[in-house]
């Protein structure tokens, strides 16, 4: 019966050995455990692991010496020309005496790595038929190994092969994992800094934000952005110093460019990393670093801010500890400098636009509105409630498309602000949004205002007029109170939405337009469609992406924010110095119903600001009277058998002698609002004057 190496140890013995070796975290520990096992088994006095590095043609050596620290050599050339090279070409067990060992590999004997021994054995470590090293066993006495002992050593070697491969794989995986984690963290830092700086158009704010982020992530205490001044040979320096971590100091100054380290970077367009000493020949403003930080040695990193081939400025970072500027951190700081360069470019462009706005009033109107709102994607919208968060998420989702949006909500909920936010976030925000209130325009003029008219199209049309749809070409048109649009005008609006074309009044020329429509109403369009007061086809065309604005009573947590914002805005406008609102007032405001929503709240706050004496808002809450909601009257007549709506209205009008409103009017008897009855009469073609 042939001998199986592992059977000699027994199942439990093999399990114990395997478990012991598998528990080792690294190769040094593995070698230590292996040495102890072979000593206890009286198989050898010492053991070592030699790994072959095929790419570099070198070897790594791990050994354990009694009463000594573990021995570890990596990337060794001398070891690579030792016994391990022999088993690579002839994968058999290598066995020799000390004299034979020294004669074959004298360089190893001269190196003192191997103390005098009796017998030496090297068995190949292999995985999937590939030899990647060897396992050394040494006896210090003259006893040779028996065949049985060789077999046991072979068993140990097989286990060590598996464990070594696992440890190496784990090391590679850990390195890869650490690399991925570092890349992930670096990406998060880049995203955070990009988001923080790209919206800053004021240079002071930009530098402050850049400094805050770099200090937070890198613990760098002195951050500056250096730009060339419009004055020749001068530099504008925007600096932030974190002498006090909680209260950083911000400075702006102008200095001479000549002889500065910044000048060197402007010329070379390359990063400069340098250790500064107080005895160095430095420009005055650079020497101030030692005054600021107590004469400590400064490490200075200057990164060019490039926009294409144009040098915009320099990001200057100073730190007392050189270890901050590691290779990894420098690579990340270079990428941060690229983002900062974009932000600086934007800020400089903004400054140029601001300088030219007096000369370009008409052309810059839309751009000025956009820049005024650039610090907030949602302009003047105030709210942190879940209801408003849901609305703003919908705004973000639909803004970049050209889909029609229908904004639904009670009066005073801020439908126009939502429409403006959609426009500002869209690709059409380089042009001004055109607005129109359908309820504020007489029906006879609404068509002319929307579509324009030619000269002489009707009495009083003395000149051609461009309508809102033409003005809104390549932009957005906001139709407020679209539910009040007359029925006879609705088909023409539908045609524009479907065909993107229309005709001016008094003209048969078709005008093409590219308009994104945003409509709003506080009315129930579904009910109006059911009552035949609104066209169903237009409703479905408008209702592509409805956004429901919550009334103020459904987001009471936003009321304190709104109250504070209105108070400070109105006080500033009226020249009042009001800087606080009593907590009890805010609680009371939050518990009110606000049928007029945000608009009503703003009006109440404005009245309170006018009446306040002092710097604390004084609000007389008993003066606020909430109107009862209007309810339709109860009907006092019913339709007779076989009588339709037309016949019923005609009969009641005859009974009231054509009187529609009032306590004895037809609307009261039918249980309808006056406006509802008039709308139905118009739809049914009923002329009350013909009935009297």
UniProtKB/Swiss-Prot annotation:
Cross-referenced CDD domains: AAA
Swiss-Prot/TrEMBL GO biological process terms: DNA-templated transcription; phosphorelay signal transduction system; positive regulation of DNA-templated transcription; positive regulation of DNA-templated transcription initiation
Binding residue positions for ATP: 409-416, 472-481
Gene Ontology cellular component annotations, sorted alphabetically: protein-DNA complex; transcription regulator complex
Listed InterPro entries: AAA+_ATPase, GAF, GAF-like_dom_sf, Homeodomain-like_sf, HTH_Fis, P-loop_NTPase, Sigma_54_int, Sigma_54_int_dom_ATP-bd_1
SUPFAM superfamilies on file: GAF domain-like, Homeodomain-like, P-loop containing nucleoside triphosphate hydrolases
Keywords from the UniProt entry: Activator, ATP-binding, DNA-binding, Nucleotide-binding, Transcription, Transcription regulation, Two-component regulatory system
DNA-binding positions: 663-682
Phenotype on disruption: Loss of formate-inducible expression of the hyf operon.
Record domain Sigma-54 factor interaction: where: 381-610
GAF domain mapped to chain residues: 202-344
Any one GO molecular-function label of the UniProt entry: DNA-binding transcription activator activity
Function, in words: Required for induction of expression of the formate dehydrogenase H and hydrogenase-3 structural genes. Also activates expression of hyf operon (encodes the silent hydrogenase-4 gene cluster).
Protein name: Formate hydrogenlyase transcriptional activator FhlA
Organism: Escherichia coli (strain K12)
